[in-house]
Amino acid sequence: MKLSSLPSGLGLASLLGLISSATAYSATDLTTMYDWNQIIKPLEWGQLNFIHTTDTHGWLGGHLRDARYKADFGEFKSFALRMKELADFKGVDLLMVDTGDLHDGNGLSDASDPQGIYTNNIFTYLPYDILTIGNHELYQAAISNNTHEYFVPHWNGTYLASNVQIYNSSNELEQFGGESTYFITKHGVRTLAMGFLFNFSSNANNTVVTPVETAIKSEWYQQQINRTDVDLFLLIGHIPVRDYDEWKSLHASIRKVHPNTPIQILGGHSHIRDFAVYDEASVSLEGGRYCETVGWLSIDGLSASNATRQYVGRPVTNETRQSYPNLPKPATPLYYTRRYIDFNRQNFRFHTQQSEDSFDTPEGVELSKVIKQYRDDLNLSYVFGCIPKNYYMTEVSPQAEDSIFKLMVDHILPEVLVNENRSSVPHIIISNGGGVRGSMYEGTFGPDEMFQLNPFLTNYYNYIPDVPYKYAKKLYSILNGGSTLRNVNDYLAALNPGYVTSDDFGEDGDDTVHTYVSTYAVPNVLQAQVGFNTTSAPETVDVVFLNYFQTKVLKALNTMVNETIYTLSNVTQYWVREDGKDSSPYMFAQYVQQEWSDYCD
């Protein structure tokens, strides 16, 4: 498949202009050796089965420093093809689904212009049956346009974006992807699929996201759910499967019309492994993030399927329901199993019942070569410096000496974010903990690690000059108190030794038994104070803040002074580089370069 707009090269100086010369270093495995002798639990196949990925965020080349999740998408393709073969051998159905967010998080996706064109192309090699859109496909108009023009057509109507539209070249609104698709599985299950994005409002102005509750009232949706030729409603979406009204509303709208028809939900966005119950014939699965997890779901007891009943799984019993109350109860319960597969070659081989020599397919091997070539084209082995020790995101307290957040507050923010014209003015710097996507590990640090740590190229540090300190000093508590700390489960990154998942069916979903690792919550807000006199507080300070906080900062200051004094006209970019590389990811790269470039010797 030819994907237009794929560049032949991006220009080293353009991407990596932080230092004048570079040395390429091969990736080093910095984690302890994976215990391949630990127990891997087999999959249970039903009449209808699903392989699910979500929130891959560009990690298609694998976690090069972590054996637990080291498989690349070439090995995943071999896994997918072998699983399709197994499904045919067993005489059952297998569908592959992805629920969005294909970039923002890895050099393979983010070092291209626009972001995602390499990883989008890699995705087209995979035998996905249904896909849907994520919010990260919509933040930037260039990404939305490229995805809509070159990626969506490849899927021939199976890329669904039921509540997302885009302005075309004639400035007319059209569907970003399909509203729905109808198909009959190999074993006779008449399936109607729809794909939704959560009620997202931070999209670029070339796209429109219709709230799910509004989409439900539309004529096309009502026509679809009133069809009488449907054995299974397949709802996929970039929406967390737990505690979201979007899913509850969609489920209720169908269940009121079809009391007994199975409704299968596959979600995403919250970056966790999860399985949630809606009713006796409706469950939901979320398959993690960052190519750390392949989600697996099987359904048995489908009367519409001509596949042989497998007699696996368990019915929904007394689990807490995610659905709205007082809905019709399905008369015939179904039987379900779920697994969360660690994204590595060993587990893929185990589940496909292949040896080391027999596992790879020619197509998978070829895709691994393509991925390696793309990494070379993007020069992802370039090195800014070498980190002398690990700095952790969630494994230690944010106040610990080896916490990445303490490193940011004590060193990165005050030492990198320098404005020569204002450096003598006392200032506070406000940043967000949620912008950090992982730990900094000992060893080489290049563009790949930079984007893994912080992929937000549209985040800049702005400032308001000469704010009375009596107001500025209150901003931290106001911003930090605006919402509770993020759920630590949202940040289960590549922890050692692995995931321990608890969901509505219990704690046996992980295919590999891991040791539980306690984690610390990620702080909402980080603050550094720079240039303060130790004996007295300043009268005024510069307030430096990530543009992510801009609206909230202005609102908070105006509320404190009880009038609208501070507006966008008071805001100026604080950290500015001549080469234009002054968005938040490059803050980390510059710090590594200026502090640790000599550690590579």
From Swiss-Prot:
<dbReference type="GO" id="GO:0005576">
    <property type="term" value="C:extracellular region"/>
</dbReference>
<dbReference type="GO" id="GO:0006154">
    <property type="term" value="P:adenosine catabolic process"/>
</dbReference>
<dbReference type="InterPro" id="IPR014485">
    <property type="entry name" value="Pesterase_C1039"/>
</dbReference>
<protein>
    <recommendedName>
        <fullName>Uncharacterized protein C1039.02</fullName>
    </recommendedName>
</protein>
<dbReference type="InterPro" id="IPR004843">
    <property type="entry name" value="Calcineurin-like_PHP_ApaH"/>
</dbReference>
<dbReference type="Pfam" id="PF00149">
    <property type="entry name" value="Metallophos"/>
</dbReference>
<dbReference type="GO" id="GO:0009166">
    <property type="term" value="P:nucleotide catabolic process"/>
</dbReference>
<dbReference type="Pfam" id="PF21953">
    <property type="entry name" value="NadN_nucleosid_C"/>
</dbReference>
<dbReference type="GO" id="GO:0005829">
    <property type="term" value="C:cytosol"/>
</dbReference>
<dbReference type="GO" id="GO:0009986">
    <property type="term" value="C:cell surface"/>
</dbReference>
<dbReference type="InterPro" id="IPR041823">
    <property type="entry name" value="YHR202W_N"/>
</dbReference>
<keyword id="KW-0472">Membrane</keyword>
<dbReference type="InterPro" id="IPR053828">
    <property type="entry name" value="Nucleosidase_C"/>
</dbReference>
<dbReference type="GO" id="GO:0016020">
    <property type="term" value="C:membrane"/>
</dbReference>
<dbReference type="InterPro" id="IPR006179">
    <property type="entry name" value="5_nucleotidase/apyrase"/>
</dbReference>
<dbReference type="GO" id="GO:0008253">
    <property type="term" value="F:5'-nucleotidase activity"/>
</dbReference>
<keyword id="KW-0732">Signal</keyword>
<feature type="signal peptide">
    <location>
        <begin position="1"/>
        <end position="24"/>
    </location>
</feature>
<dbReference type="InterPro" id="IPR029052">
    <property type="entry name" value="Metallo-depent_PP-like"/>
</dbReference>
<dbReference type="InterPro" id="IPR036907">
    <property type="entry name" value="5'-Nucleotdase_C_sf"/>
</dbReference>
